[in-house]
Regions:
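Transmembrane beta-barrel wall of Gram-negative outer-membrane proteins
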Residues: 184, 191-220, 228-272, 299-300, ...
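Face-selective signature of the C-terminal outer-membrane beta-barrel domain
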Residues: 251-260, 299-489
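Short acidic/polar hinge/loop motifs at secondary-structure boundaries
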Residues: 128-156
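Structural signature of Gram-negative outer-membrane beta-barrels, strongest in the C-terminal barrel
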Residues: 386, 405-417, 442-574, 663-665, ...
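N-terminal periplasmic "start-of-domain" segments of outer-membrane beta-barrel proteins
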Residues: 46-79, 104-107
Length: 755
């Protein structure tokens, strides 16, 4: 096993060294043989920014051979959102359900992939994998703070062959604030309902050879959930990032840059898995039970990346990054309730809240209505640490072949990540609504294991354009080795004498092909096919196979004046779908994957934007509409701890079949108003088919938001945002445990200052 990993590391590192050596050799040749010309002079910041992004602009997104969406800086500023869930609502094909109301840990699905903890998307920041351990433990309990992002990119379909390891649904790239090309400083702050405060500030500059930017985000709230007495239910987050870049001058014939990025973030949130009963949701949807008074989440995150860029006459560009991320978290939260002192009398909060009448003695302890001695409430310290590190490189080459154009991109990445679980349970008694520690656990008495992964990935993408036709063909390799070392709860010192080892390995070649043909100047059609992949986990009793699928899409784009329209149909045929045992999805929280088997996901995506008024008018009325239809079906019968009994024909849970988002704006002189409406149809919370039972669905709901911006001058802009204008108490999920509500009405005012 270890020899295989070493060979993989050597193979990956060798390829990267070859590419780097080629770049240095090419640089020397260039200096010796080519004089600087005006055609080769271009700003290095353009090279650096493009290397970190998948798209870079809405224009690029609208000219792919597959589906793509670019959330621009202007779009982010217009709506004023700090919640990634709301930022992505307008993107067709994106399926999101809320959990905490602030977007702290979003649940994002692309084209019907599993939404829980965004574990089936390739999540990146500046082109580098950002999930804590995307191969070993893909559930993204860390998500980059959307409030400090410059732009957000979403790729789906055959256009995402460069990005992995999750290639069925798509990729999301969070683009952080770039180093400016001149001195720039800014402050963006807001304050409002529930003592919610958000402040973001940055400072940056660029000189002939040196550039930098430093940014800081503070995000905090008292929270909109309350209990009796008034317990802490809020959160705070800090996030600081700095970038330092050395680069050649603009006059250099060959542009180079070396950039160092460092970041630290932490969080303390009083979040819980405890929801509400149906009866309590109907009368007090923002209530929190007393049994959750000890629940809290603490996290620390450190990121670092050293990136080298080189561009030869703007024809050959090579980007190489060395990166390391560390994430630690301890989610201390209620897990089980016990009546008496015996294990047989212990029940999970999920079970208790499913039927509060049958479980009345347990429910009374949860609410504090009944005193209980001994080990009445079991609170679990879900302490885990994650390491993620690697080296990646890509080379982009552009070539003119007569009247046609050829673009080649070759990339490789060696990546290693790990999750270290060292969890324990504490027991509390309940007296007069207050919890008191009865018995403290010891580290590792609930879970004590390490899961590690080593992966080598590479790809080749070719793009050929001639006249009105564009063809792309790509091939991706994913080779991953996963190792699990369970030291068991009986060996907290990890001596290894009781250790249970397991491993798994998967190697897949993933082809893709796309076509774009411009029928008329404003109208084009496109289609694509690619193979989907997701790495497997280590199963106890059998060697689990990776997730595999064949995915097809076709669509058309119309760009006529100020009218932009896109319509796409897709069909994902899974030969082997995988599910995960997540506590966030109602499972036991082992993170072990289970085999769903054959399944299909098909859907339709529509996007339209229009400026109906002439540009010469002082008043503008921008309109945008997006719609997503998603139909899922599993073809096998099986049982899992997370989903229970599943039958052929059942639909996947937590996927909206219908989702609609509409935006209307009013722009007049220095004033800008925007209204957003989103509608989500009924959504299943467990696998099923036919009519949805009320106890197993999230009912359809429509939520309206609004934002106002007044530009006092070029440096100062006043902002106001309203969330959930109708103050609708709407249900967002029935997991992790019990019913929970979305964000109620909130009003926030602030100012943006730019120097």
């Amino acid at each position: 096993m270890h020899q295989h990993i070493c060979k993989k590391a050597i193979r990956g590192t060798s390829l990267i060294l070859v590419l780097c050596t080629t770049s240095l050799y090419g640089h020397a040749q260039k200096r010796d043989s080519i004089a600087a010309s005006s055609d080769s002079i271009h700003r290095i910041d353009e090279v650096v920014v493009s290397a970190k992004q998948m798209l870079g602009s809405k224009f690029e997104a609208s000219n792919r051979t597959g589906s793509a969406y670019y959330v621009s800086p202007k779009e982010i500023a217009k709506l004023g959102y700090t919640d990634i869930s709301r930022m992505l609502r307008a993107v067709p094909g994106v399926n999101i359900y809320e959990e905490d109301g602030f977007g702290l840990r979003p649940n994002i699905s692309l084209r019907g992939t599993k939404a829980e903890r965004s574990e089936r998307i390739s999540l990146m920041e500046d082109g580098i994998l950002a999930a804590p351990a995307p191969y070993a433990a893909p559930a993204a309990y860390y998500f980059p703070n959307a409030a400090r992002m410059h732009a957000i990119e979403v790729l789906k379909g055959s256009s995402q062959v460069q990005y992995g390891p999750f290639t069925t649904g798509g990729a999301v790239n969070m683009v952080s604030t770039p180093i400016p090309n001149r001195f720039t400083a800014g402050l963006r702050t807001s304050f409002g309902s529930y003592n919610t405060f958000n402040a973001y500030t940055y400072l940056g500059n660029d000189t002939k050879h040196l550039g930098y930017v430093v940014e800081y985000l503070r995000y905090q709230s008292k929270g909109f959930r309350r209990d009796e007495p008034d317990e802490r239910t809020g959160f705070y987050r800090n996030d600081i990032v700095g970038k330092l870049r050395w680069h050649t001058s603009d006059e250099a014939s060959t542009s180079q840059a070396l950039e160092l990025k460092l970041g630290f973030a932490n969080e303390h949130s009083d979040e819980t898995y405890v929801g509400l009963s149906e009866a309590d949701f109907a009368t007090r949807p923002y209530y929190r039970y007393r049994g959750a008074q000890m629940d809290e989440m603490r996290t620390k995150h450190f990121q670092s990346a050293l990136t080298h860029y080189i561009s030869f006459n703007n024809k050959l560009k090579i980007t190489t990054s060395l990166y390391y991320n560390y994430f630690w978290r301890n989610w201390y939260k209620l897990s089980d309730i016990s009546v008496g002192f015996h294990k047989g009398e212990k029940r999970s909060i999920e079970t208790v809240l499913e039927d509060t009448e049958i479980n009345a003695p347990y429910f009374d302890i949860l609410t504090g209505a009944k005193d209980a001695d001994g080990e009445a409430l079991i609170v679990r310290a879900n302490q885990r640490s994650y390491h993620s590190r690697g080296i990646q490189t890509k080379a982009e080459y552009k070539l003119s072949l007569g009247s046609s154009y050829l673009g080649l991109e070759l990339g490789a990445r060696y990546h290693a990540d790990s999750e270290d679980r060292f969890q324990h349970d504490d027991s509390y008694s309940m007296h007069s609504g207050r919890m008191t520690l009865y018995r403290a656990g010891w580290g590792g008495d609930q879970s004590n294991r390490i899961t590690a992964a080593h992966a080598f990935a590479s790809y080749l993408l070719a793009k050929w354009s001639f006249s009105k036709l564009t063809l792309t063909a790509g091939l991706r390799l994913e080779d991953v080795e996963i190792i699990k070392r369970d030291y068991t709860t009986k060996d907290p010192r990890r001596t290894g004498h009781l250790r249970i080892d397991g491993d798994n390995h998967a190697t897949e070649l993933l082809p893709s092909f796309g076509i774009n043909y411009k029928i008329l100047k404003p109208l084009s059609i496109f289609a694509g096919i690619h193979q989907g992949f997701a790495p497997p986990s280590v199963a106890k009793y059998y060697r689990q196979k990776p997730e595999k699928s064949i995915n097809l899409e076709s669509g058309l784009r119309l760009n006529l004046g100020t009218l932009r329209m896109e319509a796409i149909g897709y069909y994902n045929d899974y030969s082997n779908m995988l599910g995960s045992d997540l506590a966030a999805a109602g499972g036991q929280g082992t993170l072990d994957q289970f085999t769903v088997g054959a399944a299909t996901v098909k859907g339709f995506e529509f996007l339209a934007s229009w400026q109906p008024l002439p540009r010469a008018w002082r008043v503008q009325l921008p309109l945008q509409l997006s719609y997503t239809y998603t139909d899922t079906k599993m073809k096998n019968e099986f049982y899992s701890a997370a989903w229970g009994e599943v039958f052929a024909g059942d639909e996947l849970p937590y996927i909206y079949k219908h989702a609609l988002n509409a935006q209307i704006g009013l722009e007049w002189k220095k004033l800008e108003l925007n209204f957003t409406m989103r509608y989500n149809g009924d959504m299943r919370t467990i696998p099923g088919q036919g009519p949805m039972a009320d106890a197993h669905k999230v009912p359809a709901h429509m939520i309206m938001d609004a934002s106002v911006r007044y530009r006092l001058n070029n440096k100062v802009t006043f902002t106001a945002n309203a969330i959930n204008l109708a103050n609708k108490a709407y249900l967002t999920s029935r997991h992790p445990s019990g019913v929970r509500a979305g964000h109620p009405f909130g009003l926030y005012g602030g100012v943006r200052i730019t120097l």
